[in-house]
Amino acid sequence: MKIERIRGGVSLRRTIESGTEEQRRAVLDIIANVRDRGDAALKEYTERFDGVKLDSLKVTEEEMKRAHAAMDAEMLEIIRQAAANIRDYHKRQKRESWWMTKEDGTILGQKVTPLDAVGLYVPGGTAAYPSSVLMNVIPAQVAGVKRIVITSPPNKDGTLPAGVLAAAYELGVTEIYKVGGAQAIAALAYGTETIRPVDKIFGPGNIYVALAKREVFGHVAIDMIAGPSEIVVLADETARPDEIAADLLSQAEHDVRASAILVTPSMKLALAVASEVERQLETLPRRDIAQAALENYGAIYVTETLEEAVDVVNELAPEHLEVMTAEPLALFGRLRHAGAMFFGRFSSEPVGDYFAGPNHVLPTNGTARFSSGLSVDEFVKKSSVIVYSETALKQHGDKIAAFARLEGLEAHARAIEVRLEKGE
């Protein structure tokens, strides 16, 4: 890994992939075709892009039961424990409707309502992610969403990854479709003969999925446009190089565009970590992916002081931040921008990916400066409630009418005055 002495001025805000003109046109064509031809278009795209001809798009209950039965019993118990932790954490995020009554009899409040239906896209490719099923489905269930739909591209044999199906079965999700890519997003947004539309779409995917989510946004809601995974480790001379290297590689192995950065005031630690990364790379199964990520988006930044290192971390605003210093929680108040913060050497990033309970769907590309990770809030909507009393309207009606006329809206003013029997 390259080592660089710095004094601020760094950024994770890489160029956001907007796709080529050809890719954008392809996505628009796919969406239009799915809207026009429904299931027939989905099956054609599945045969073309995934190499499998399907008679039915929907995963059967029997397929889910087989996948669940084939799962190792110990692994199933781990999934159950992780699910319990995730559910316990997210229950604390749930908001209830509330009311307040003022002295004049006015009642004001907020009604919190779960979304009716949500869709979760689970990507295929080089790895299967049952953890993504847990992290997206559980907060939806805690919020009270009644209909949860999963779509995922099928394997060449027409099946979905057993881990994904087993996790969904454990959570009681039964509406799952063998559809991937932009065509899946189109189906979730607009519906087909088999797939009823949803209100909001969640989950990461490739550039075609990202472009499709952008295109359907407004007709339905979306969670975010997820970028490649990121980790920043803030460490001092007390940290262990082998642990830091392992954590950097844990993100680098995700994707060739993943980012892994160490920020430290210790050149000795920087050199040791760089050496340890090379040593650990030798035996990593996904070595080629991790190495490409480190070459393109990996770095070790050396600052003059720990205080400067904290400033650099806040500028980076990473998806994942690990703090491995002599007194990690002493920095809690100064650290402002990160999707998730992991304090201390035993809080390795994969703890949050799989088991601790907080959500692993987090803002990337420096957007942790202004956005948050996935939560129960993403699965509800809030409506203002106003029950104005006659006393209150008589007391404030003239003010409301005056405000309306200030903006040139006479009908607004008259709507108030007719109730005060002052209409002209």
Swiss-Prot record:
Substrate binds at S229, Q251, H254, H320, D353, E407, H412. NAD(+) binds at Y121, Q183, N206. This is Histidinol dehydrogenase. Zn(2+) binds at Q251, H254, D353, H412. One of its GO terms (molecular function) is zinc ion binding. SUPFAM superfamilies: ALDH-like (SSF53720). GO terms for biological process: L-histidine biosynthetic process. Keywords: Amino-acid biosynthesis, Histidine biosynthesis, Metal-binding, NAD, Oxidoreductase, Zinc. Its cofactor is Zn(2+). HAMAP family: HisD. Pathway: Amino-acid biosynthesis; L-histidine biosynthesis; L-histidine from 5-phospho-alpha-D-ribose 1-diphosphate: step 9/9. CDD domains: Histidinol_dh. Its EC number is 1.1.1.23. It catalyses: L-histidinol + 2 NAD(+) + H2O = L-histidine + 2 NADH + 3 H(+). It comes from the Bacteria. The gene is hisD. Binds 1 zinc ion per subunit. The active site is at E319 (proton acceptor), H320 (proton acceptor). Catalyzes the sequential NAD-dependent oxidations of L-histidinol to L-histidinaldehyde and then to L-histidine. The keyword Transcription does not apply.
